[in-house]
Curated annotation (Swiss-Prot):
Residues 27-155 form the EamA domain. Belongs to the drug/metabolite transporter (DMT) superfamily. Plant drug/metabolite exporter (P-DME) (TC 2.A.7.4) family. InterPro entries: EamA_dom (IPR000620), WAT1-related (IPR030184). Its main location: membrane. Keywords: Membrane, Transmembrane, Transmembrane helix. It is found in: Membrane. One of its GO terms (molecular function) is transmembrane transporter activity. The keyword Metal-binding does not apply. This is WAT1-related protein At3g28100. GO terms for cellular component: membrane. PANTHER family: WAT1-RELATED PROTEIN (PTHR31218).
Length: 353
């Protein structure tokens, strides 16, 4: 009984941590959409926020991972973390450009394909097993297909508005910024970029799991990763904006608030992800993505005066059904493995008796 209670508490910690990170990610996406209308440059935003995040995380290295027995930080591990940083840079750049073209709601809807993509990659890299004789495997495969179909619906079918938001009395958003709406062509471009982002995200989940299996130091890995992203995004920004140095000047308004908020969320986000992927695997990280669309719809309606379109609703529903199918299959698979281990533990006791 005590073991069961302890297990449930442990699961509750993972669940709460992941829900908090997803809420933070959607929140910063919404804030970024507002800040860009006030002149915040993407590369300045990423470079400064990741640099500040690394500085916030630096003190933790002196009293966390140093107290543990860890393998040496070899060139191989550093190379993998550097590659992870490159992947991270690509997915944050494509992701935020995609949000500029579309909306945080679309970004959250399309991110629901991450479990499906991660599952496919996990099979390729032998982190997940598939047997069509087992219901759990069939559920995971069908859920993957359903999620991909849903993502295509969200991107390719805009549809009529099913919910038209209006600014609440206490936020007159039209005075803060121009209307943040997207044309059909922008919606398609944004959807394509966000899909590319989620491919990078899924690959990074797999690589992160590989790194944490050989070097299980969440704070150190997160710090080095964040530093890598800061360097890569800043270098790209210096090249892209070489004729426009004024973009690196940050004003004391919502742009600064966005950068500081992003830094705080980033420093916590990647530590939680590294810690979770070590104990639960890459698919566990990915299955929380569908929940972000519910958060995004509320935040976009309240803060961005965005409307909800039929294509996003239908696609989001299909993706969510696919998500729960994958999650059900994963849960049943873990349950079967636990029963198998328990049976093996009891067998020697019966023989000794």
């Amino acid at each position: 009984m005590a073991r069961t209670v302890s297990l449930w508490r442990r699961e509750a910690v993972f669940l709460t941590a992941m829900l908090a990170t997803e809420t933070g990610v959607v929140g910063i996406s919404t804030l970024f959409k507002v800040a860009t209308s006030k002149g915040l440059n993407l590369y300045a935003f990423l470079g400064y926020s990741y640099l500040l995040a690394s500085l916030l995380l630096l003190p933790s290295l002196f009293f966390t991972d140093r107290s543990r027995s860890l393998p040496p930080l070899s060139l191989s591990i550093l190379s993998k973390i550097g590659l992870l940083g490159l992947l991270g840079s690509m997915y944050v750049i494509t992701g935020y450009i995609g949000i500029e073209y579309s909306s945080p709601t679309l970004a959250s809807a399309i991110s629901n394909i991450t479990p499906a993509l991660t599952f496919i990659l996990a099979i390729i890299f032998r982190m997940e097993k598939v047997s069509f004789k087992e219901r759990s495997s069939v559920a995971k495969v069908m859920g993957t297909i359903l999620s991909l179909i849903g993502a295509l619906v969200v991107v390719l079918y805009h549809g009529p508005r099913v919910f038209v938001a209006s600014s609440p009395p206490y936020i007159n958003f039209r005075q803060l910024s121009p209307p943040l709406s997207s044309s059909n062509s922008d919606w398609l471009i944004g959807g394509a970029l966000l899909t590319i982002r989620d491919i990078f995200v899924s690959v990074s989940f797999i690589l992160q799991a590989k790194i944490m299996s050989t070097y299980p130091a969440a704070f150190t890995v997160s710090f080095l990763y964040i530093v890598s992203v800061s360097i890569v995004t800043s270098m790209i920004g210096l090249v892209v904006e070489k004729n426009n140095p004024s973009v690196w000047i940050i004003r004391f308004d919502i742009t600064l608030i966005t950068i500081v908020t992003m830094a705080i969320i980033t420093s916590v986000y990647y530590v939680i992800h590294s810690w979770t992927v070590r104990h639960k695997g890459p698919l566990y990280l990915a299955i929380f993505k569908p929940l972000s669309i519910l958060i995004a719809v509320v935040m976009s309606a309240v803060f961005l005066n965005d409307s909800l379109y039929l294509g996003c609703l239908i696609g989001g529903l299909l993706i969510t059904l696919g998500f729960y199918a994958v999650m059900w299959g994963k849960a049943n698979e873990e349950k079967d493995q636990l029963l198998l281990v328990s049976g093996k533990e009891r067998t020697p006791l019966l023989l000794n008796g």
